[in-house]
Amino acid sequence: MATKMAGVKRAGRKRKERKNIERGAAHIRSTFNNTIVTITDVEGNTISWSSAGTLGFRGSRKSTPFAAQMAAEAAAKAAMEHGLKTVEVYVKGPGSGREAAIRALQAAGLEVSLIKDVTPIPHNGCRPPKRRRV
């Protein structure tokens, strides 16, 4: 009693539509292990994103400034296909890829209008990790 359902379309899957966005925001999250670059429009909807891990960097190479630079370039190229020209950069985290990612966004052709550090600072919240002994 197995019948084939011929011509059934997949539900829920939308095609990517090409938006035409001039201004946006680049959110750079730079941790000790990875760098994630997300480019959004002014409302906060994601246009493109990239990270050092998605580009094939593994292990300790994910946390390098070069990996952050490549992630920022990849996200910027994908965002510029949607017509993005100007970004405000919001940097979060203590990682080594912060400055490299900002420079890569500028080198890719995006005009940076604002650079703001939005790293969350606890008012004596959680206990921090223990000191490393190398």
UniProtKB/Swiss-Prot annotation:
<feature type="region of interest" description="Disordered">
    <location>
        <begin position="1"/>
        <end position="24"/>
    </location>
</feature>
<dbReference type="InterPro" id="IPR001971">
    <property type="entry name" value="Ribosomal_uS11"/>
</dbReference>
<comment type="subunit">
    <text>Part of the 30S ribosomal subunit. Interacts with proteins S7 and S18. Binds to IF-3.</text>
</comment>
<keyword id="KW-0694">RNA-binding</keyword>
<comment type="function">
    <text>Located on the platform of the 30S subunit, it bridges several disparate RNA helices of the 16S rRNA. Forms part of the Shine-Dalgarno cleft in the 70S ribosome.</text>
</comment>
<keyword id="KW-0687">Ribonucleoprotein</keyword>
<dbReference type="GO" id="GO:0003735">
    <property type="term" value="F:structural constituent of ribosome"/>
</dbReference>
<dbReference type="InterPro" id="IPR036967">
    <property type="entry name" value="Ribosomal_uS11_sf"/>
</dbReference>
<comment type="similarity">
    <text>Belongs to the universal ribosomal protein uS11 family.</text>
</comment>
<dbReference type="GO" id="GO:0005840">
    <property type="term" value="C:ribosome"/>
</dbReference>
<dbReference type="InterPro" id="IPR018102">
    <property type="entry name" value="Ribosomal_uS11_CS"/>
</dbReference>
<dbReference type="Pfam" id="PF00411">
    <property type="entry name" value="Ribosomal_S11"/>
</dbReference>
<protein>
    <recommendedName>
        <fullName>Small ribosomal subunit protein uS11</fullName>
    </recommendedName>
</protein>
<keyword id="KW-0689">Ribosomal protein</keyword>
<dbReference type="GO" id="GO:1990904">
    <property type="term" value="C:ribonucleoprotein complex"/>
</dbReference>
<dbReference type="GO" id="GO:0006412">
    <property type="term" value="P:translation"/>
</dbReference>
<dbReference type="InterPro" id="IPR019981">
    <property type="entry name" value="Ribosomal_uS11_bac-type"/>
</dbReference>
<keyword id="KW-0699">rRNA-binding</keyword>
<dbReference type="GO" id="GO:0019843">
    <property type="term" value="F:rRNA binding"/>
</dbReference>
